């Protein structure tokens, strides 16, 4: 089973990318049906192109390369922007608040897909809890021992008493209709990127006051 899951990770990662593109396509169809302004149609077509380009890039060149945390965050925010607005979620971008940038070694496409998956999880659980004001935070930290990390957090229900080992186990999910593979795939992507997925406790990292729910860190280990 483990061998099959490892072999499936690239394909499942592409599936996560296509999920983001599908949301843009839905918005594009809705815009055309209501006769939206041509500039809006053009904007959505451009977004769809940018969402699909990483898929073709991954298929052409799956090998790891060099990028930065800031670029990964920018790309992930771009792919999730429409969904965040649709669900009335306020984005707090730590990179606008002097969070440190750092170099990253790995597959840019897979890492962006991993971040997008974390954002998608936050959107889902924020809708489930439905607080009066919904917040999503994405930034970086050097507070976790072992290496710099990208942080995604929200003010949803959090992970409760779930064990971190269970959260990254394949087929473990509390999401109705979920496959239980999202965090497993993210963990595998981090493993091959010389990193790991971490679930910081309250007080482990510096976060905006609004972020009181789930917090996930993608840590790139120092070598």
Where are these regions (language model features)?
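Short beta-strand/loop element within the Bergerat-fold HATPase_c
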Residues: 133-146
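Conserved micro-motifs of the catalytic ATP-binding
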Residues: 60-65, 103-106, 174
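Detector for a conserved hydrophobic position within an alpha-helical segment of the HATPase_c
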Residues: 190-191
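Glycine-rich ATP-binding loops of the HATPase_c
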Residues: 194-207
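Conserved DHp (HisKA) dimerization/phosphotransfer helix of two-component histidine kinases, i.e.
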Residues: 20-31, 36-90, 94
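Acidic ATP/Mg2+-coordinating residue in the GHKL
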Residues: 154
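Short helix-loop "hinge" at the ATP-lid/N-box region of the Bergerat-fold HATPase_c
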Residues: 121-126
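Short conserved segment of the HATPase_c
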Residues: 159-171
């Amino acid at each position: 089973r483990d061998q099959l899951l490892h072999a499936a990770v690239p394909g499942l990662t592409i599936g996560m990318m296509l999920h983001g593109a599908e949301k843009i396509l839905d918005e594009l169809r809705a815009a055309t049906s209501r006769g939206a302004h041509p500039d809006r149609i053009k904007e959505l077509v451009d977004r769809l192109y940018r969402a699909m380009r990483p898929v073709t890039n991954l298929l052409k060149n799956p090998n790891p390369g060099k990028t930065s945390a800031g670029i990964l965050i920018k790309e992930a925010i771009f792919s999730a922007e429409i969904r965040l607005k649709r669900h009335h979620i306020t984005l707090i971008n730590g990179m606008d608040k002097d969070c440190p940038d750092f170099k990253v070694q790995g597959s840019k496409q897979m890492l962006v897909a991993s971040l997008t998956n974390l954002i998608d999880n936050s959107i889902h659980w924020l809708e489930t809890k439905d607080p009066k004001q919904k917040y999503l935070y994405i930034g970086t930290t050097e507070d976790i021992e072992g290496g710099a990390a990208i942080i995604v957090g929200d003010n949803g229900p959090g992970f409760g008493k779930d064990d971190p080992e269970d959260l990254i186990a394949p087929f473990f999910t509390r999401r109705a209709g979920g496959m239980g593979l999202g965090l497993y795939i993210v963990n595998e992507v981090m493993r091959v990127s010389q990193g790991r997925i971490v679930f910081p406790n309250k007080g482990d990292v510096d976060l905006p006051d609004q972020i009181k729910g789930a917090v996930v860190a993608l840590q790139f280990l120092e070598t």
